[in-house]
Amino acid sequence: MGMQISSEGVVVVELPDEPETTKELENIMRCVEDQDGCDVVLDFSNVTILTSKSLAPLMLLRGLLNTYGRRLVMCCINPATKGVFSVTALDAAFEIVEDKAAALALVEPHADRSDSP
């Protein structure tokens, strides 16, 4: 799919559907380590279902970001996948918002700071 790294230390990723989701989450963890920490926005637009195989790397990513004091925000999650988070009570463990704009607003609250004198 696509991974974009901004100059503000934000990685935005359009996750692929299963079975590639787990591999992409592992790639994101390597990227976070290479960046010495960054905020991550995961766009689930292309994910039709999330399997238990992807939940473990997702939790590991959240833990890694916590060690750096950074955020993981997930967006564009379809109802079936939201159901997986709800049933497993993981919806309380993650920041989940409706769309990418809302996710970016959480991790880039001062995106206009380059315009400041």
What are these regions (language model features)?
Residues M29-V32, V40-V41, K53-L55, L60-A105, ...:
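Amphipathic, Lys/Arg-enriched alpha-helical "gate/interface" segment within cytosolic domains
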Residues M1-R30, F44-I49:
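STAS-typified acidic loop motif
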